[in-house]
UniProtKB/Swiss-Prot annotation:
Entry annotated with the keyword Ribosomal protein: yes
GO molecular function: structural constituent of ribosome
GO biological process: translation
GO cellular component: cytoplasm; ribonucleoprotein complex; ribosome
Keywords noted in UniProt: Ribonucleoprotein, Ribosomal protein
Ribonucleoprotein in keyword set: yes
Protein name per the record: Large ribosomal subunit protein bL36
Amino acid sequence: MKVRASVKKICNNCKIIKRHGVVRVICKEPRHKQRQG
């Protein structure tokens, strides 16, 4: 899980979703998981 100021899609499988006001990237590649902080 990377915590970043700006989250971006890294590959085509990445999806940007918003959970409880937190922007997240979910992907089948575990290294691509991100969260905005």
